[in-house]
A protein has these predicted regions:
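Conserved small/polar residues in nucleotide/adenosyl-binding loops
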Residues: 189-191
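Leucine-biased recognition of intrinsically disordered, low-complexity hydrophobic segments
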Residues: 7, 11-12, 23
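Short acidic/histidine-rich motifs immediately flanking catalytic phosphotransfer sites
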Residues: 98-103
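Glycine-rich, highly charged phosphate/nucleotide-binding loops
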Residues: 78-94
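Glycine-rich phosphate/adenosyl-contacting loop at the front of the ribokinase-like
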Residues: 18-79
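Conserved beta-alpha-beta core of the PfkB/ribokinase-like small-molecule kinase fold
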Residues: 106-186
Length: 191
């Protein structure tokens, strides 16, 4: 064979001994633009999203909105490196290249300028599915970085989404209700 492997033109069906012809078609993986923070410590954010999507056969395209030394949930005040200037340039570059995204996914957006990046991505790729994880709080409390203005911007972003993925606390914040954990706990006790 001269060192070249030959592609099989048929698939053997187990337990039957029959071969069925098949065609091999190159398939370009789906591209997901992941607009999220990158936390150096904390098992969250882009550090978790990127490998999960890759294993699923999806091509994740990272757009870090901010690089944090740790996540913002109780580990003190993290060191921060804002990614908005980079994000603007990256979006323009992808658009100039003619990159098409099948999906745009947003996670933690720690400021209004970061929400603006997501809004711009939604406008540049209107046909992409839009998934918003409105990361704003947990366990009945909003994160310390969440302001009323940020909540309003994230609420508006959710209105443009095809799918939103709030946890219980975030759903309460979006609905302008006081987040609480007691109601959920009482409901679970009576199941």
């Amino acid at each position: 064979m001269g060192g070249c492997a030959r592609l099989k033109s048929a698939l053997l069906i187990p337990h039957t001994g029959k071969e069925v012809p098949y065609l091999i078609h190159p398939v370009e993986p789906k591209k997901v633009l992941c607009i999220h923070d990158l936390s150096g410590m904390g098992r969250c954010s882009l550090a978790v999203i990127l490998p999960v999507l890759s294993v699923m056969g999806v091509q994740p395209v990272a757009l870090p909105t901010v690089v944090l030394s740790t996540h913002t949930g109780g580990l003190g005040t993290p060191a921060r490196l804002d990614g908005c200037a980079y994000g603007e340039q990256a979006l323009e570059h992808y658009h100039a290249l003619g990159v098409e995204f099948d999906c745009i996914y947003t996670g933690y957006l720690g400021g209004e300028d970061q929400v603006a990046l997501a809004e711009k991505a939604f406008a540049l790729w209107p046909a992409a599915k839009k998934i918003v994880d409105p990361v704003m709080g947990d366990n009945g409390k909003a994160y310390s970085t969440v302001t009323p203005a940020l909540i309003d911007r994230i609420r508006a972003l959710c209105g443009a989404a095809d799918l939103i993925l709030p946890n219980y606390t975030e759903a309460q914040i979006l609905l302008q209700r006081q987040p609480q954990t007691e109601l959920l706990t009482l409901s679970l006790i009576h199941i």
